[in-house]
Amino acid sequence: MADPDVLTEVPAALKRLAKYVIRGFYGIEHALALDILIRNPCVKEEDMLELLKFDRKQLRSVLNNLKGDKFIKCRMRVETAADGKTTRHNYYFINYRTLVNVVKYKLDHMRRRIETDERDSTNRASFKCPVCSSTFTDLEANQLFDPMTGTFRCTFCHTEVEEDESAMPKKDARTLLARFNEQIEPIYALLRETEDVNLAYEILEPEPTEIPALKQSKDHAATTAGAASLAGGHHREAWATKGPSYEDLYTQNVVINMDDHEDLHRASLEGKSAKERPIWLRESTVQGAYSSEDMKEGGIDMDAFQEHEEGRAGPDDNEEVMRALLIHEKKTSSAMAGSVGAAAPVTTANGSDSESETSESDDDSPPRPAAVAVHKREEDEEEDDEFEEVADDPIVMVAGRPFSYSEVSQRPELVAQMTPEEKEAYIAMGQRMFEDLFE
């Protein structure tokens, strides 16, 4: 059961006391801030900014001044918003018990200071020597009096002293104390009236409350914003959440493609249109390098040359098939070379017989097709051998199993499976291939 002497509402005398004190000894900004706290038990700092329209720095200076003088108290609370973000807010309120004690202390301190000034003014020096600047009080008048001349003379230089007007109090201290008591009498009356007031704990330490005026303005602003968003259409939905989003701040998408680089290069070239061939590919820029007859006889096939160049630009996917075909072609060329070697003496004999003929018959006779065919086969065989030497891929051992050098280069996991001896052989083979390439 609650104590009947405990008040659950702040008496009007306490509110008037706070208003009198704040208006009598502080500025208008302090009075406005305290008026809000008198009307509302506990107010958030942001709400006070909204009501007073002060700058945040100015408002905090005013509140810190009042808090330093123990007129108000501050309480910090951590609040969680709807989006899960936590913020700290300062709530200010008046502890009326502390306010009464502070007012009593400050008034008593002022009264004591006035009494001290009164006591000091009665004991100040009232006589001063114009020569040696010695000062004397009223209690030393018997020492200064000279009965022969009937004057007050200095005890050091025997010069007649003068009354020290600068040491005289400008105002009577007893008058100041009387005026102080007269002006502070309304505050004294309120203090006597609130002497035995006992306030409940929820009044001394109030909980935060919402200001009705601010609530109405916020509801009206929310309604207006909702209507504006509906009228604006769907393009305003992107601005619905103004808070920053950090979901994708530390997310990195890495795509690892295990396909061959040749496929990627070919895919990138598919969407591009074929460019016109430059003049040095379409025809020779060297005068007399190739004759028209050689072009017609098939000595140089420009279309085949173009296809070969395009084939070099994009590597062949069927490398294994081409390797098998080249090996088969080599075997065929070797068999044909054996048959040509058997017919070579006959050709040589025919050539020696033809030497006895005249030069005129040599010019008129057509070229022998057998010799041309043999010469062409030899050239083709040499070209095939050179191409095969270039096309042959060295064999590398990986954990005792044979693999081609190109396959190991494209699959780094095979290198990890090598023994130290196999890895040294693999590195040495790569160095030799690199040296052969630039020799």
Curated annotation (Swiss-Prot):
Gene Ontology annotations of biological process type: transcription initiation at RNA polymerase II promoter
Chain positions with N-acetylalanine modification: A2
Regions of compositional bias (Acidic residues) in chain numbering: 354-364, 379-392
Classification via PROSITE patterns: HTH_TFE_IIE
Stretches annotated zinc finger (C4-type): 129-157
Database matches in Pfam families: TFIIE-A_C, TFIIE_alpha, Zn_Ribbon_TF
Residue sites binding Zn(2+) per the record: C129, C132, C154, C157
Keywords: Acetylation, Metal-binding, Nucleus, Phosphoprotein, Transcription, Transcription regulation, Zinc, Zinc-finger
Biased composition, class Low complexity, residue ranges: 333-344
Subcellular location: Nucleus
Limits of the HTH TFE/IIEalpha-type domain: 14-104
Gene Ontology annotations for the cellular component aspect, listed alphabetically: cytosol; transcription factor TFIID complex; transcription factor TFIIE complex
Entries under SMART domains matching the protein: TFIIE (SM00531)
InterPro entries reported in the protein's UniProt record: TFE (IPR039997), TFIIE/TFIIEa_HTH (IPR017919), TFIIE_asu (IPR002853), TFIIE_asu_C (IPR021600), TFIIEa/SarR/Rpc3_HTH_dom (IPR024550), Znf_RING/FYVE/PHD (IPR013083), Znf_TFIIB (IPR013137)
Molecular function via GO: RNA polymerase II general transcription initiation factor activity; zinc ion binding
Major location category of this protein: nucleus
N6-acetyllysine modification, residue list: K67
Family the entry assigns: Belongs to the TFIIE alpha subunit family.
Function: Recruits TFIIH to the initiation complex and stimulates the RNA polymerase II C-terminal domain kinase and DNA-dependent ATPase activities of TFIIH. Both TFIIH and TFIIE are required for promoter clearance by RNA polymerase.
Name of the protein: General transcription factor IIE subunit 1
Naturally occurring in which organism (per UniProt): Pongo abelii (Sumatran orangutan)
Phylogenetic classification of the source organism: Eukaryota, Metazoa, Chordata, Craniata, Vertebrata
